[in-house]
Amino acid sequence: MKTIGMIVAVELQSVLKRYGAKLVKRKETAGYQVLEYETDQYRMVIVNCGPGEIAAASGTQFLISEYHVDIVMNFGVVGGLTEEMSKTKVCIVEKVVHYDFDTSAADHTEVGRYSQYPDIFLPTTKVLSDTARKIHPELVPVVCASGDKFIADPEQKIRVHEMFSADICEMEAAGIVLTC
């Protein structure tokens, strides 16, 4: 049976409503609220890590080390950077850009670029996003701008969208992708 790890920053009740599997175990461990569910097809371990990239990276490593998860999913609320995405209910992230990662003063690389990647975009697992879109065609593929800053200012949303071609923004994805 596959084990799915899920990182949730805030709204744990939304996950429970969406996935509605049978709760097997609920516990507090290593500073995390951990919920374990099972269906006939998979086991799901949900960690409520709190908001932010460092919290998400830590929660992701916890899932990998302690539960040996096969995949990690990020479930949460995002902000739309375009009018269309402000109205969209569900999406699937195909690429992530860490918009507030900036070493350009030291190494002259572009903002968001990690040297081990060919460009500013951190890839997600293509086979997973393709499979998810086959099962749920309503999922809109997006580029996610991730950073440790809640973006509420409309002008800043426009800047992030224009600078990185991002459709949504949130605070956990870069930490999760870099950890996996």
Residue spans for each PLM region:
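N-terminal short beta-loop-beta anion/metal-coordinating cradle
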Residues: 1-61, 66-67
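Mid-sequence, gly/pro-rich, charge-dense loop/helix-turn segments that line enzyme active sites
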Residues: 81-164
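Short glycine-rich, acidic/polar surface loops and turns
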Residues: 170-180
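Phosphate/ribose-phosphate-bearing ligand recognition and processing surfaces
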Residues: 1, 82, 86, 179
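Catalytic beta-strand/loop module used to bind and position nucleotide/cofactor moieties
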Residues: 164-170
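Proline-aspartate-enriched helix->loop->beta-strand connector
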Residues: 68-73, 166, 180
